[in-house]
């Protein structure tokens, strides 16, 4: 599973924050290796089948998201590594941004609530960014 959330990272519990920070890089890594296809790509954000494929051409969104996740992890005092791929293609059609719709945010928040750990942790930020 590769989760890409849409809500601000500050809203995520520690478990979801760290998991997304770790999993998000799977998409740019696949693109860097040429192991992706835009065929059958959904036109709208979705969960489940097609979730990852939706983001294959949204590297700008993923980069911004990863930077926000990384900053939030550091602000909470987590020791995390920065693993954004430096070998991504420069094709403009792969570097699209994405502005989540209200419906996409609603779907994402519902999924986060559904998957909230029984003992969710919310470490307070140790520094303002």
PLM region spans:
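Extended, charge-rich alpha-helical interface modules
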Residues: 1-129
């Amino acid at each position: 599973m590769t989760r890409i959330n849409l809500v601000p990272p500050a809203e995520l519990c520690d478990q979801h924050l760290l998991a997304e920070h770790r999993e998000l890089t799977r998409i740019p890594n696949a693109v860097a290796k040429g192991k992706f296809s835009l065929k059958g790509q959904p036109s709208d954000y979705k969960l489940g089948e097609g979730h990852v494929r939706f983001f294959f051409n949204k590297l700008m969104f993923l980069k911004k998201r990863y930077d926000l996740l990384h900053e939030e992890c550091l602000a909470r005092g987590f020791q995390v590594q920065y693993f954004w791929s430096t070998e991504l293609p420069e094709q403009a059609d792969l570097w699209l941004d994405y502005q989540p719709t209200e419906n996409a945010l609603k779907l994402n928040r519902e999924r986060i609530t559904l998957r909230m750990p029984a003992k969710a942790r919310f470490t307070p930020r140790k520094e303002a960014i």
